[in-house]
Amino acid sequence: MNYVKIIEKNKNFIELELVNDDHSLSNLVKEILLAKDGVILASYGVEHPVLDPDTGRYISNPTIMLKTDEKTDAETVLKEALKDIVDLCNKTLEDL
């Protein structure tokens, strides 16, 4: 089961762990965050993945790190980025 674990959170920094995931969502979130004003750092890291015998997918627990400038609230920017991803998915569904 996939879920998100908050590792660290303050006004200008958030680190999340995406448990049992791969590069897909982490990379997308990072790219959307990098386009946002006030973002100083948006990155993700993945330790060596393992093969999930149930799904045949290589999974790991990627961590996403977001750092913002002093004027920008990290949680707000992360929520905006996640909303942008949902909007992109909805637009794609409409266009199909």
Curated annotation (Swiss-Prot):
Q: What does this protein do?
A: DNA-dependent RNA polymerase (RNAP) catalyzes the transcription of DNA into RNA using the four ribonucleoside triphosphates as substrates.
**EC number annotated for this UniProt entry:** 2.7.7.6
Keyword terms of this UniProt record: Cytoplasm, DNA-directed RNA polymerase, Nucleotidyltransferase, Transcription, Transferase
Where it sits in the cell: the answer is: Cytoplasm
- Annotated protein name in UniProt: DNA-directed RNA polymerase subunit Rpo11
Family note = Belongs to the archaeal Rpo11/eukaryotic RPB11/RPC19 RNA polymerase subunit family.
Q: Which GO terms describe its biological process?
A: DNA-templated transcription
Q: Which organism is it from?
A: Methanococcus maripaludis (strain DSM 14266 / JCM 13030 / NBRC 101832 / S2 / LL)
Main subcellular location of this protein, as a coarse class: cytoplasm
GO CC, sorted alphabetically, is: cytoplasm; DNA-directed RNA polymerase complex
Reactions catalysed, as given in the entry? RNA(n) + a ribonucleoside 5'-triphosphate = RNA(n+1) + diphosphate
How does this polypeptide assemble, per the annotation? Part of the RNA polymerase complex.
